[in-house]
Amino acid sequence: MIADNKAIKKRIIELQAKLNIIFPQLYIDFLAKINDGDVYEVDDSGICLYSYSDLEERNQTYQIKDFEPNYFMIGQDGDLGYFINVGNPTDNSIYSNDLGALGSLEMEKESNNIFDFIGQNEK
């Protein structure tokens, strides 16, 4: 991770406007700390979290908005996707679901926020 980057935060705000969604603040803070274009791997877990520049393409590829309109995919581990709730931007929780079962299975809460999810205690 790198220090907060104002240029990246500006691009995140532009992405939110383009997609007409609002990310939870702690997730914005996380995105601003990782390098653009880098995939953030959670230790050696196989879980990869996308940088802001990959988010739109990944969500389009998996048609997330069609199947889970209140959620936005932020990463994955094989067929398991990780999501934030953009239907409630005050919800900082991280959720998961099988990418082949979107829309038919309930989202499963994995963590209270992105920093707990990656094993860091920051805000």
Residue ranges and their predicted role:
Residues 1-88, 122:
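A surface-exposed partner-binding patch
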Residues 81-109:
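Segments surrounding the PLD/"HKD" phosphodiesterase catalytic module and close analogs
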Residues 102-122:
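Compact, glycine/acidic-enriched structural inserts
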